[in-house]
């Protein structure tokens, strides 16, 4: 009995504190949305729009923005009922901690962490955190941004799963994560130069690896292209049926042209 009263008192205290932080807005609770299974012949090929879930996620996004106005810059719900929250880079730890620990959120699983390179932007890298709430069967996508030189605070202190994800982003994109316990390359080889997923990284790379029969080991050499510019408008010597290639005369005629007489 005493434990039940204590739990009720603690929930009331949390609700009061959330109400105070939300500037008078009542707490918004994510409710699990049940999806009824359809038959094999009527099952849609794409996920249908759920208006109830869409309104609920939109209200929860506004609730998060009012509680954390210092960090949340934009909130939107995608067509597939996924909430996207765009935050300032300084708000990575506070926002992720709030979404993980808040009673009405409980996004305790970091499903994926990746980056997007858009060179035309001033802050060319977009860092994307995909979170999952098993309690409410809901997903949320947290986005932030940075450039080549500005580090992002590591999320390992909030989600242990971010360790290797951040190492992969550092290896592929060159985004530095501050306070990471072991930030080093994870996919490329030792001594690799550059970051392959950057849009300005050359398609051929900088070095090529091959096995040298003389030294009996794998060696790395600068890339040497025998032909810098290649024109592909030619007959391939490996073409199996060159005689069956469509002649220019039988190509599609323009409107008003007459068909040439057959010889």
Swiss-Prot record:
This is NADH dehydrogenase [ubiquinone] iron-sulfur protein 3, mitochondrial. It catalyses: a ubiquinone + NADH + 5 H(+)(in) = a ubiquinol + NAD(+) + 4 H(+)(out). InterPro entries: NADH_DH_suC (IPR010218), NADH_quin_OxRdtase_su_C/D-like (IPR037232), NADH_UbQ_OxRdtase_30kDa_su (IPR001268), NADH_UbQ_OxRdtase_CS (IPR020396). Pfam families: Complex1_30kDa. It is found in: Mitochondrion inner membrane. GO terms for biological process: mitochondrial electron transport, NADH to ubiquinone; mitochondrial respiratory chain complex I assembly; reactive oxygen species metabolic process. Core subunit of the mitochondrial membrane respiratory chain NADH dehydrogenase (Complex I) which catalyzes electron transfer from NADH through the respiratory chain, using ubiquinone as an electron acceptor. Essential for the catalytic activity and assembly of complex I. It is a peripheral membrane protein. Residues 1-35 form a transit peptide. The keyword Nucleotidyltransferase does not apply. It is an enzyme of class 7 (translocase). The keyword Cytoplasm does not apply. Belongs to the complex I 30 kDa subunit family. Core subunit of respiratory chain NADH dehydrogenase (Complex I) which is composed of 45 different subunits. Interacts with NDUFAF3. Interacts with RAB5IF. Found in subcomplexes containing subunits NDUFS2, MT-ND1 and NDUFA13. Its EC number is 7.1.1.2.
